[in-house]
């Protein structure tokens, strides 16, 4: 529960996992478990295999005023069996409200939300 009540702001996060040496879970510009009452704002996040990933038990989190772009699998890369997809924001198994507002999302895929009981993304 180390990130509860945290603020992550004004960072420039880029070029995470571009060599594709790690193709499974846990790879992202910002990756948090149990993001309870966390604020992620005014970050510039680009050229990662995934931008922001809030996993398991996110509630009361807010993602605001961020610029995300080019968060895609690098050109020519081979997708690994069981590897994760790429997008700017991924909310997985959230337990409460998550507010996503006033962001600029410019990657090929901007948002994946898999927190409902049916496990269907938006």
Which positions does each model-derived feature cover?
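Short glycine/acidic-rich loop motifs that flank beta-strands on beta-rich extracellular proteins
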Residues: 1-7, 13, 17-26, 49-57, ...
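Solenoid scaffold repeats with emphasis on beta-solenoid/beta-helix
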Residues: 6, 33, 37-38, 60-61, ...
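Extended ligand-binding clefts on enzyme/binding-domain cores
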Residues: 30
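Conserved small/polar residues in nucleotide/adenosyl-binding loops
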Residues: 113-118
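N-terminal low-complexity segments that are often proline-rich with Ser/Thr-Pro
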Residues: 120-122
């Amino acid at each position: 529960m180390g990130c509860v009540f945290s603020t992550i702001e004004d960072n420039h996060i880029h070029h995470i996992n571009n060599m594709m040496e790690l193709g499974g879970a846990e790879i992202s510009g910002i990756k948090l478990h149990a993001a309870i009452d966390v604020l992620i704002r005014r970050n510039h996040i680009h050229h990662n295999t995934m931008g922001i990933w809030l996993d398991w038990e996110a509630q009361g989190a807010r993602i605001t005023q961020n610029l995300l772009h080019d968060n895609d699998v690098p050109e020519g890369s081979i997708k690994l069996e069981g590897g994760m997809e790429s997008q700017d924001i991924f909310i997985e198994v959230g337990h409460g409200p998550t507010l996503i507002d006033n962001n600029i999302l410019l990657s090929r895929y901007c948002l994946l939300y898999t927190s409902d009981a049916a496990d269907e993304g938006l």
